[in-house]
Amino acid sequence: MVQERIDLKNLFVEIRRKGSTSQVSRDLDVSMGNISDWKNGRSVPNAVSLVKLADYFGCSVDYLLGRTEHRDMI
């Protein structure tokens, strides 16, 4: 079944775990505006950004999208 709404809660858990939005923004060369838009539901990360984020946090894209609660990549 296709999920209608993307839940990025795990993305923001990971950002808090790293310390700050500004640090993640600098490290990944993603604008603070983009991260703010993701947080406020105005947009979602594109596929390239999702892969970058998953690699950065050491987790799966499915975890970031809220499709699984298992953080570890398989």
Residue ranges of predicted features:
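A short, Lys/Arg-rich alpha-helix, primarily the initiator
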Residues: 1-19, 23
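Short alpha-helical DNA-recognition segment
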Residues: 18-37
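Short coil turns linking two alpha-helices in DNA-binding domains
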Residues: 31-33, 46, 60
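DNA major-groove recognition helix of helix-turn-helix/homeodomain DNA-binding modules
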Residues: 48-63
